[in-house]
Amino acid sequence: MDNSSTLIDENTPLVQNKQERQESFRDLKGHVKALLAAFYMAMIAGLNDGTLGSIIPRVKQYYDITNETISLLFLCSATGFFISAGFNGFIVHHIGQLKAIYLGGTVQLAAYFVLMMGFPFPVMASAMVCSGMGMALMDAAMNVFTANLPLATLMLNILHALYGVGAMISPLVATYLLEHDISWKGMYIFLAVCSIINLITVTVGFMGVKLDEEHDEDNTDNQQSRKALTKAAILHPMTIIGALYILIYVGDEVVVGGWGYTYLTEGRHGDPIAMGRVISAYWAGLASGRILLGYLAGKFGEKLMITVFTMMIIGCLTVMCISADVVLNSSVIISIGLLLGPMFPTTISLASKVLPRSYHTTAIGFISALGAGGAALFPFITGMISGKFGILSMPYACIIMTLGMLVLWAMIPSDKPFFGYFQKNK
């Protein structure tokens, strides 16, 4: 076996799947309702992550605060993500995956009700902790469920493309509110309505679906207690490296999509309405990249293509550092969205192949929940940096994050040689 796959042995699904028949869309029959519910959860996640960045200027004005202070909202959200990441396996094993989804959705909805009221800033910050906790539980669940379906790689690409669609919609709604002089609180009213629909789709979609069926089988097969299984899953190298990679990746993604609006309007003096549409186009690029570039990554090899895309992102960020032209910066930001697209679903797909199936709920849930915390942690750090050095420091911070991604990606195991496509077609 190739040296890049040293963490994979003959007993992992990665090797076993090579001998199985080709999967088809017929294999998804019976999963359609649940899959649609998971897709909608992904859109909710995107709506959530795309919201705060698009309303930062108005929230700053409402509370009369600085970039450093408002960045605390990202930190509070990250705290909620990390709490859920630490307890996700425990919660799922004790109340089941479906109840964990309901718990996450209910906590998320409660947070939106608080946020729409415009309470004092400390209350808003506390609500962001709850929002992060709820979102992390749902994020982990939708990734675990989808990663174990037939055609998992394609379904994950669609799942995360819909995340991008959700994140694209948020700036459009925020821009509409700005154009019609409606308070930023309207964004959270909109999110609360979407969250109510989410609880309905979960109820209908997962009705009769045995999400926890595999746990009993896996525990019997592996002769391990749940505690030992959870520990082994989290300490697996794929889990640790994958979680760190996704942590930085999601941070990079949301820093550009979140602080990008402030960067373009305050740093490059772009028109607020037009720049809101640019950020929507960034998220649309992300959604498109997850399908189009995800296909290229699968065809030519994930390790090679993701490395190429990452290096191209570094080039784009360098252009942002040296050019003050708002049109060029806008174009580059949209391009970054396209290039970032396939990275999350590709990592989750590789994890589902490398890890034993008994690890999937805990390991993929941990990768997703901890990694999604990057959507709050790194925007917080970037906000602190921009408060000290100015918003034009944002692309420099993103370059550092992207270099970290490049190093971690080189450490992630793969089922193909680095130049697998070219070796195969010699």
Predicted regions and their residues:
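Intracellular juxtamembrane helix-capping segments at the cytosolic ends
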Residues: 136-150, 342-356
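Helix-to-loop junctions at the C-terminal end of transmembrane segments
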Residues: 84-97, 289-302, 386
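Helix-breaking motifs and short loop linkers at transmembrane-helix boundaries and internal kinks
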Residues: 64, 96, 117-122, 269, ...
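C-terminal transmembrane helical hairpin of 12-TM major facilitator-type secondary transporters
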Residues: 300-347
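Conserved MFS/SLC helix-loop-helix module at the cytosolic interface between two early adjacent transmembrane helices
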Residues: 83-122
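Helix-loop-helix hairpin linking two adjacent transmembrane segments in secondary transporters
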Residues: 152, 158-213
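Extracytoplasmic gate region of multi-pass secondary transporters
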Residues: 52-53, 235-288
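Cytosolic juxtamembrane N-terminal segment immediately preceding the first transmembrane helix
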Residues: 1-41, 45, 230-232
